[in-house]
Amino acid sequence: DMTSMFSACTVLAELKVPNFNTEKVVSMFGMFANNKALTSLDLSSFNTPEVTTMKGMFSGCSALTSLNISNFNTAKVTDMYGMFFSCEALPSLDLSNFDTEKVTDMYGMFAYCKALKSLKLSSFDTKNVKNMSFMFFYCSSLPTLDLSGFNTENVTDMGAMFKYCLEMEKIDVSKFNTEKVTNMRGMFSGCRKITSLDLSHFNTENVTNTNTMFFSCDALTSLNLSSFKLEKVTDMGSMFFACEEMKTIYCNYTWKCAESTSMFAYCSKLKGAVAYDENKVDVQMANPETGYFTKKTPSGIEKSVDTTEAKIVDIYSLDGKKQTELQNGVNIVRMSNGKIQKIMK
């Protein structure tokens, strides 16, 4: 057990451990935590085949600029909670050798790594991870992040996952499985340079909190939330607060929520079924009929019909029942020119 072994050695500027035998060590929890003066650490000699927890191992090493953990064996590690939390001066991390198959907790793993500009996670196996909240919180210098290999099928908490990634211009979460996620509070809050986000596939059926989810996403001009039903959400407060360049939010659903204070505040360019009104900024405007949402037309469906060329002769529902007028949603129509097509009302 090496738990907190060198923890809080606040004036320790140099540490050399080349002869440490660590092959039977099970816990390295907080081993170097809060060594605020340490600038360089070479742990390339560490053999860690039995270690199960690296929770907070380097947490608070705020002066650390060089860290060699290239030979770490993490095959048995289950807990990486806050492992590099507040390593504020660390410019790069290459964890491409990490085996994370058994890890269940990555809460705040890289939070407050403010100087981090390069982060390699290509080998990360995250299929058993349940908590990714605050994982990249305040990685304010990180310009890009490759999460294409992330398996999030068991994640329940993504709260503040990318919050205050101030320099991030693009985050590819197109492969995220969010079926079990309950918390998305502040997930992209303060991501001021992101110009696009593909969330069209997100499953939000179990989400209960989206408060400040897109707070101050200053560069976003549109969002496709067409899959967002949010039927279980109880807090949508400030969800789109200060999305100053936002013009269009695509969503076909009407949202309802108990708490929605300032939901659309300072979104002056937003327009959906109606133009933006600074006096109407709560969940009552979260709909595509009388609110700020715009309906997303499915591929292959005509949004409207040019009645100057052809007129609607017959209208049918998707189950083949004849209708007297266009219904909300998808309609099958026969035109006066004989053409059969689908249109969305």
What function would you assign to each model-found segment?
Residues 332-345:
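C-terminal tail/sorting-segment detector
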Residues 296-315, 319:
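Residue-level detector of functionally pivotal "anchor" positions at catalytic/ligand-binding pockets or at interdomain
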Residues 1-298:
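Negatively charged
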Residues 328-330:
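Extracellular Ig-like/FN3 beta-sandwich strand-entry sites
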